[in-house]
Amino acid sequence: MIHPTAVISEKATIGENVTIGPFCVVDDDVSIGDGCILKSHVVVRGPTRIGKNNKFYP
């Protein structure tokens, strides 16, 4: 689920069953693995690779 207020780059790769909360930003050249959770207001700048089943808080 991607919250409607989240901003996700078209150049980002998002895995399956990923939750991206309100007001998150996922930048270019970011890969988020399956099952990850980004709580509200998380910003991920590239180049970044995130493995499976991680949880991020602001």
Predicted segments, located by residue:
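Short, basic phosphate-binding NTP loop
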Residues: 1-5
